[in-house]
Amino acid sequence: MKDARRAALAALVCAVAAQGASPVLVRGAADTRALTILQSELQRNFQTLKQQPSPAYFISYTLHDQRSTRLVASFGAVDSNDESRNRFATVEVRVGDYDLDNTHPIRGDSRAMGPRVTRVALPVTDDEQPIRLALWRATDRTFKQASEALTRVKTNVAAKVKEEDPAPDFSREDPQTYTGDTASYSLDAKAWEARLRRISAPFAEDPLVFRSNVSLSVDSDNRYYTNSEGTQIVTGDVACRLFIQAVTKADDGMELPLYQSYFASSPSGLPDEKQLIADARSMMDMLARLRKAPLVDPFSGPAILSGRAAGVFFHEIFGHRVEANRQRNVDDGQTFGNKVGQPVLPAFLSVVFDPTLRKLGNVELMGHYLYDDEGVKARRVTVVDKGILKTFLVDRAPVKGFTRSNGHGRAEPGYVPVSRQSNLAVESSKSVSTEKLLDMLRDEARKQGKPFGLLFDNIEGGFTNTGRGSANAFNVLPNIVFKIYTDPSRQPELVRGVDLIGTPLSAFAKIVATGEKVDIFNGICGAESGGVPVSASSPPLLVSEVEVQKKAQSQEPPPILPAPRQVEKS
């Protein structure tokens, strides 16, 4: 998911704590001194810039106060222990008016757009004069860049044919005021180092595991947002993430990675050390099985995607295509651009995005937030209702027919917000038991004259291309796949070496049923506005036809030298 129009590998991240040394989440009343400084300097600068020949009509300041702790261990030893604290502001200035401003796409030369925002480092303390000086310099620079960009925009608009989508460049939204608690944490790093050593140690027992690590990241982010329309937002969040990964290699040189992830915002939702060690050993067992698993040739036929795999599938091939900014871009494929009010999925499926949800069942969702990165209140959005496309995920850059944001303008700190996904949920009115779904898979394989169907049990991520310049296709990267034979007496067979490929409209049309048990994918999605936390939940999907291709394969053989024997500890 690095860029939705380019390779965009999902970087799954997770959070964990254990008994005795859990990171402690601390919430306190918001310190509004930083917000007061931002507001004062913003108003001072806005009063001057709105009087210029090409006047500024909008300014926003976002201050992020961040602290991060990252611990990494591999094969029973600590690799790194890093602590950081930083504070910075992102300055946006818009010149022109709500209908046409400096952010308007320049058709035929996207490189001519220039920078939209300026990121500037700030003191980590609330020293007013240094902060104001930094904001003043950044605002002046951003205004000059915006003024030059508006000149290019007006020239481009005059020289090109009339646009298909004449929507305004910026939506008018109601000012919001919200002052939430700020967040911080305390962490016993030494205790966690010992814990990560123990969790990572089992991988040293297998000499064919070439790379492995266990990483813990604990991050706090206190955000202060204000704009010239009167919006003032203060929010604070802490995220604890733990990531277990290991890589082995088959005899033919194919690298076989596996990942396990956990996420929580407080210790109460996190597994203990015993469970984590058990998960690490289960991963080792699966790696050993994968080394011996046969390769699969390119195949076209029926398949089941597990709930988690289906979540990634929908995130990649559906979610990116309903982000409104892709409907504005003339270079985008605009898969659903003119399909509002029309069927785009089977009638038994609905898709919602709900950033207001903190949990689904007992699982915390990474895509939760109260206000988006443009200061708009988060809300539940039903994008597809019983198969019919109803709307898009909209930020403050409207598209034809949708003139207001629905709270999905998102960005990694320091980037320009665009419409992005939050907590995706696939809902089905045609669900069956796991046993019935497997029977339906076998029946579909028999009908097509296939000896087996496929079960995609786990997916590490994927990428999708939504542009017009190349195939409007997706590539999803499974790492645990089984053959399900039409003969029910034959056990499922673990296989390796395939990627799931296809085009979106064809794939959606071939979903024929779903299972009952909903599973959840939590991860970081990267696109134009950087990496943002998301989740995707779905029941298992039965698809009448999928296509798989051979996975890219390393030509480097396994090591010739034997691995050193494990050191006996007295």
Question: Where do the model's predicted regions map?
Answer:
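N-terminal secretory signal peptides that target proteins for export/translocation
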Residues: M1-A4
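Short acidic (Asp/Glu) and glycine-rich catalytic loops that position anionic groups and cofactors
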Residues: P175, L258-S265, Y415-S422, I484-E493
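Short clusters of small/polar residues that mark proteolytic maturation junctions
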Residues: L258-Q260, V394, V495-D499
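C-terminal, non-catalytic macromolecule-binding modules
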Residues: I388-E444
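Bacterial N-terminal signal peptides
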Residues: A8-Q19
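Local beta-strand/beta-hairpin segments that build beta-sheet-rich folds
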Residues: V383, K390, E493-V495
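Hydrophobic alpha-helical bundle architecture
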Residues: E427-S506, N522-E528
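Active-site bordering "gate/hinge" segments
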Residues: G20-R380, D385-I388, G401, F452, ...
